[in-house]
Amino acid sequence: MTDLPDSTRWQLWIVAFGFFMQSLDTTIVNTALPSMAQSLGESPLHMHMVIVSYVLTVAVMLPASGWLADKVGVRNIFFTAIVLFTLGSLFCALSGTLNELLLARALQGVGGAMMVPVGRLTVMKIVPREQYMAAMTFVTLPGQVGPLLGPALGGLLVEYASWHWIFLINIPVGIIGAIATLLLMPNYTMQTRRFDLSGFLLLAVGMAVLTLALDGSKGTGLSPLTIAGLVAVGVVALVLYLLHARNNNRALFSLKLFRTRTFSLGLAGSFAGRIGSGMLPFMTPVFLQIGLGFSPFHAGLMMIPMVLGSMGMKRIVVQVVNRFGYRRVLVATTLGLSLVTLLFMTTALLGWYYVLPFVLFLQGMVNSTRFSSMNTLTLKDLPDNLASSGNSLLSMIMQLSMSIGVTIAGLLLGLFGSQHVSVDSGTTQTVFMYTWLSMALIIALPAFIFARVPNDTHQNVAISRRKRSAQ
């Protein structure tokens, strides 16, 4: 990339900045949840909604981000994304109640939903095609550093300052990024087709109310009738979308995607798989602090081996999949992650704390292998004319399943414990034990889906290439 103009390199730095902000925010909050609960006078069992409100908003807004960038311009949308994310951070820091914090996190989520996909689109437009992979590697590297720094930095700020600072640090970074975007980034636009607003609203309503109904089933004060009504509204909205998308060439996501078997299996497996693994980043720091009495900083440091294991495994995951095939790798990593989850719970409850970093490192390796395999399985056989739509749907499902996973984790804690779980409670470790056992079972269930994946990987790739070349 040394032969790129200086202006283009600066634009890549801006995109990388945005990737870093978004990835840091996804991990820095987890370590601070117990301190937030104490400061806001809430039960720790309710704090999962701080994560859910952000991730669910990202899932809802993702389908609109690419269309908005093409219609209004990548600079205008990227600038708007940074401003919304920064304002959301400010309002998070100023929040005095849990409801205020949830609204502020939703505003952050709107910005976060546009930042990464619009950043990818910007890179596609400003660099030559032959340098696109090198440019994407450059801008996504800070996004890999964010999860590494997030837990420890969050714990450090909480322990030696206050939880408000995990949001306040975004403000100067956001201001610099917004100004640089206005000054340096070109405002590319493209001719767009009409946006599928009806489909977007149906999907948004369906995802939001079903998640709310799931969360409302324990300890929120919603009546059974209200919850049943929410479920009915959500199901009707999703069924209406299916009817809307049938034979509709302008649908947000074409139903033709599901004619590709590996896409259908991969998407179903990704949804179920990320529900289970989405619980882990929320539950692990909460368990370390509330269940075992770790300090926020110590709990944050304990998360670093998991990220290192994930980053290290990315270097060899392709060779592993090529050697053993998708079916074997996905079934083995799914069951393996369930066993590692049980191992983490056992070693922690036995007090073998010196073993935990190694267990978390192993967890990161297994999880990374499964994530990469699920992503490539889902998209690898799609024809070229459906690849972009399939990738967008996969991104939305990834965020949605993570929000559902965190919601279920909070639901399990509320089911097995009281509304006042604390370090001083004699039953706290028992509550967490039952929760971890349930999580291990949920994590293992997608193995039944992955067992149906065709095993001849190389043949599938060849078939896929012949299909694409024939179109």
UniProtKB/Swiss-Prot annotation:
Gene3D superfamilies: MFS general substrate transporter like domains, Multidrug resistance protein D. It comes from the Bacteria. Signal peptide: none annotated. InterPro entries: EmrB-like (IPR004638), MFS (IPR011701), MFS_dom (IPR020846), MFS_trans_sf (IPR036259), Multi-R_MdtD (IPR023721). Its main location: membrane. Residues 33-48, 98-101, 159-164, 218-224, 284-285, 363-395, 452-471 are cytoplasmic. PROSITE patterns: MFS. It is found in: Cell inner membrane. GO terms for biological process: transmembrane transport. One of its GO terms (molecular function) is transmembrane transporter activity. The keyword Cell membrane applies. SUPFAM superfamilies: MFS general substrate transporter. One of its GO terms (cellular component) is plasma membrane. Induction: Transcriptionally regulated by BaeR. The chain crosses the membrane at residues 12-32, 49-69, 77-97, 102-124, 138-158, 165-185, 197-217, 225-245, 263-283, 286-306, 342-362, 396-416, 431-451. It is a multi-pass membrane protein. Keywords: Cell inner membrane, Cell membrane, Membrane, Transmembrane, Transmembrane helix, Transport. Residues 1-11, 70-76, 125-137, 186-196, 246-262, 307-341, 417-430 are periplasmic. Belongs to the major facilitator superfamily. TCR/Tet family. This is Putative multidrug resistance protein MdtD. The lineage of its organism: Bacteria, Pseudomonadati, Pseudomonadota, Gammaproteobacteria, Enterobacterales.
